[in-house]
Amino acid sequence: MVELPFQQSQALNVRQNRALALAGVFQATQLTHMTAMTGQQSIGESGNFYFELLIKASLNIRPTTNNNAVQTLDFFNQLADISLGLKTLENCITQPFTNAPKSRLPKMRSAKLPMSYAMSLLQLEKKVYSNPEYVAIIEKAQQKILKQLSFFDNNYLHPSILANLAQTYVDTAGQINPRILVRGNAEAFKDTNHTNRIRACLFTGLQMAHLWRQLGGSSWNMIFSKRKLLQDIQALARLQYQVI
């Protein structure tokens, strides 16, 4: 049985729980976008904070988890830990319809690339987790990395940890076509540490996509239920900021 990092006193409803997992995917793709465009040293402390939280979650998400008992917040400490993902997700689903949607969350400039990466990850996750060989690779890597952390003072952003996460992505989702093509600073892509960080971001998104699907998420439902999804995001925002 998987030992979950956090246990919540109050559970979200089914839709909110699923929406929060999807926000985790978008948090990963927003960090992928930020890293690719600005470089690994430029995403700031807040970016590293959100990234570390995703890594922790991705190492605990398992394909054998009891879906009925799992809550997205079992893998995070609080709603604020996925606030970047909530902002990104809301921006992505409202931007096509209006230039100035009403929102309780601050808007971001561009949603096109994070949205593209997220949709690709949702498709890749289904293919990865339908292949027992890829699932075994992920589970083996999770166990290896969790053991390694003790040697690196639990530094989830240590280059060796990121390199292992990146390699896990390459060995699984990276073997499936069409591959995700990340746009960014061409010169920075020559740096192995930079590309490892991007691939590690994508791996965390892959894992959050798996959690989302475990919770009943489907691409078709997301496409045709955008209004309900937006309502769920706004409800989560009210819970996060205690808006009355």
Swiss-Prot record:
Query: Which SUPFAM superfamilies does this chain map to?
Result: YcfC-like (SSF101322)
May I ask which residue range the UniProt record assigns to the signal sequence? none
| Family annotation (InterPro entries) | HflD (IPR007451), HflD-like_sf (IPR035932)
Membrane-topology annotation of the record: Peripheral membrane protein
A single GO cellular-component term from the record reads: plasma membrane
Coiled-coil features, chain-numbered ranges: none
Q: Does the keyword ATP-binding apply?
A: no
Q: Which family does it belong to?
A: Belongs to the HflD family.
Where is the protein situated, by its record's location annotation? Answer: Cytoplasm; Cell inner membrane
Q: Give the UniProt keywords, A-Z.
A: Cell inner membrane, Cell membrane, Cytoplasm, Membrane
Q: Which gene encodes it?
A: hflD
Q: Which domain of life is it from?
A: Bacteria
Q: What protein name is recorded for this chain?
A: High frequency lysogenization protein HflD homolog
- Gene3D superfamilies per UniProt: HflD-like (1.10.3890.10)
Provide the primary localization. cytoplasm
Q: A Pfam family name for this chain? A: DUF489
